[in-house]
Curated annotation (Swiss-Prot):
Species in which this protein is naturally found: Angiopteris evecta (Mule's foot fern)
Cellular component GO terms held in the UniProt record: chloroplast; cytosolic large ribosomal subunit
Residues passing through the membrane, by range: none
GO process terms (BP): translation
InterPro entries (alphabetical): Ribosomal_uL14, Ribosomal_uL14_bac-type, Ribosomal_uL14_CS, Ribosomal_uL14_sf
Keyword Ribonucleoprotein included in the entry's annotation: yes
Subunit structure: Part of the 50S ribosomal subunit.
Protein name: Large ribosomal subunit protein uL14c
Localization annotation: Plastid, Chloroplast
Length: 122
């Protein structure tokens, strides 16, 4: 569960290393983001000489959370870290590679481009 002021690792090669959530997109009373939700975040750590710079405001989709994710078949999945992939206004990833496992639930939210770039889909 990601809420404002939560820090996330970046799971792509867009140039950002750490993000801090500043808003969960959706309805106005939404407090938490889960896997597959879009957030507005600020870049807190960045790689030098890359397109994304520190203190830049970006959109990102949450791909991994430490909070367990319940599936319809009764299985529960949780990851070791909170991670997100930086996206543009159309919902396409800004990076060209995705690192680490990605939850299968992203397919339900039409993030198929991120699924195709991921090395492992759980």
């Amino acid at each position: 569960m990601i809420q404002p002021q939560s820090y996330l690792n970046v799971a792509d090669n867009s140039g950002a290393r750490k993000l801090m959530c500043i808003r969960v997109l959706g309805t106005s009373d939404r407090e938490y983001a889960d896997t597959g939700d879009v957030i507005v975040a600020v870049v807190k750590e960045a790689v030098p000489n890359m397109p994304l710079k520190k203190s830049e405001v970006v959109r990102a989709v949450v791909v991994r959370t430490c909070k367990e994710l319940k599936r319809d078949n009764g299985m529960r999945i949780r990851f070791d870290d909170n991670a997100a992939v930086v996206i543009n206004q159309e919902g396409n990833p800004r990076g060209t590679r995705v690192f680490g496992p990605i939850a299968r639930e992203l397919r339900e939210y039409n993030f198929t481009k991120i699924i195709s770039l991921a090395p492992e889909v759980l």
